[in-house]
Amino acid sequence: MQKSYSLQELATQIGATVRGNTDVVVENIAPLDKAQSNQLTFISNVKFRVLLKDSKAGILIVSEEDVEHCSPESNLLIVKDPYVAYAILAQYMDSTPKAAQGIAKSAVIFDGVLLGENVSIGANAVIEEGVVLGDNVIIGANCFVGKNTKIGSGTQLWANVTVYHNVEIGANCLIQSGTVIGSDGFGYANDRGRWIKIPQVGQVIIGNNVEIGANTCIDRGALDATIIEDNVIIDNLCQIAHNVHIGTGTAVAGGVIMAGSLTVGRYCLIGGASVINGHMEICDKVTITGMGMVMRPITEPGVYSSGIPLQTNKEWRKTAALTLGIDGINKRLKALEKKIS
């Protein structure tokens, strides 16, 4: 049965100032341009203010500055930051199906596993010996958790997550389907053309309140651990190589590749499809915009970019030709400078 939420109930959750009918109810959340009378919506960018006056939404989350752009009949939740308020209410109204409770009959649980209270383990999951699962842990269907791994209270693994041996995952983490944690790092020695594999015997250690998207790979350390600190969020399809260390509060967008032994500071923002060299350090509070190619350490906070923005093919070919010829242009310029001087 669809649950309903009143204006006053939602205001209480986010400490909002209310304007309108406190008894009006909504059932879910929709985009500003599509929301109907039974739906909540929000505005987080001033360029969408033109949509406010004609919005059919049952309730709008707005800032004080947005109010004058709304219809007098609109029911409003007035807050300092509408996007943060939306995030909080989205959690409160979340309709994502809950995992099945209890332990499925087809789950394989080895001897010597320690289970906390209210642990749920889905169909065909495999939990090897020595694993410790904290209270309220949820292991989805077809997951694999290797020997001596520890998973903290309240953490959820969606279906088909693979966690290798000796991994530590903190409390209240969320790991999406297809992710692999603790696979071998890319460690080899070359003996006259023959690759000799170096066993990767380090760990992966993940802090509390970490979220990892689908189909991301986090390799175990060669000797020491690969470390993901508290409150890090990592999107889909990322490659985190062995012995990478990601600091607290950093966000990593989709498709990012981090080479081995890279240290990323706290509260960094790494744009999608960026590639970052290894064996170096990025300081705290660095933003790397999408498709950044980072080959050297970054020692000062700030916003960094690389790459060529999209052009028509004709324009891009001209740009590429100029780039390839820049060394010759530089030599001619220096020759002219010598003549003038």
Swiss-Prot record:
Active site: 242 (proton acceptor)
Molecular function per GO: N-acyltransferase activity
Gene3D superfamilies: 1.20.5.170, Hexapeptide repeat proteins (2.160.10.10), MurE/MurF, N-terminal domain (3.40.1390.10)
Record PROSITE patterns: HEXAPEP_TRANSFERASES
Alphabetized InterPro entries for the sequence: Hexapep (IPR001451), Hexapep_transf_CS (IPR018357), LpxD (IPR007691), Trimer_LpxA-like_sf (IPR011004), UDP_GlcNAc_AcTrfase_non-rep (IPR020573)
CDD domains: LbH_LpxD
Swiss-Prot/TrEMBL GO biological process terms: lipid A biosynthetic process
Entry EC number(s): 2.3.1.191
One Pfam family named in its UniProt record: Hexapep_2
Protein family membership: Belongs to the transferase hexapeptide repeat family. LpxD subfamily.
Name of this chain's protein: UDP-3-O-acylglucosamine N-acyltransferase
